[in-house]
Amino acid sequence: MKTIAITLPDFFPNEAEAINRLFAEGSIDLLHLRKPDSTIDECRQLLDNIRNEYYKRIVVNDHFALCAEYNLHGVHLNRRNPTPPPCHQGSVSCSCHSLEEVVERKPKMDYVFLSPIFDSISKQGYHSAFDEATLKKASAEGIIDQKVVALGGVTHERMAQLQEYGFGGGAMLGDLWR
């Protein structure tokens, strides 16, 4: 099962060191660099302080030009950036908020996030949208599989439960950075 880290939306002191440590400790497989209000130069400054050996494990949610510039793992589509750049060679992922959306978007993606699976740690009042029976049924029907990554309230302690539901991994934000 993959463990994916999502950065906090704002930069913080020694962030690159924290990211390097997560990779070095084997705590994460991929990192989604998600800084929606950042400039491309601010993201470059962060990337310049991350060890280049980890670049192939970083996905950008904004400033897609950084993917080719730093030879990163891929891009994550969103409302701000709904399509990959021309001639993009890396992975392409997106976020889904319903099982219907997973069915529609998963075939065109390398992987998708499905959220919120549990009550969010980082977003107050953002509650789980799926009960256990729904997740087990979706897994049995092949909707949830190795290409679907759980997001929302994911912790290291919940990874075994996500594996039981058939997810290919879990994405963490709040649990990693608090």
Where are these regions (language model features)?
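Glycine-rich beta-to-alpha transition loops that act as phosphate-gripper elements at the mouths
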Residues: 9, 58-64, 94-103, 117, ...
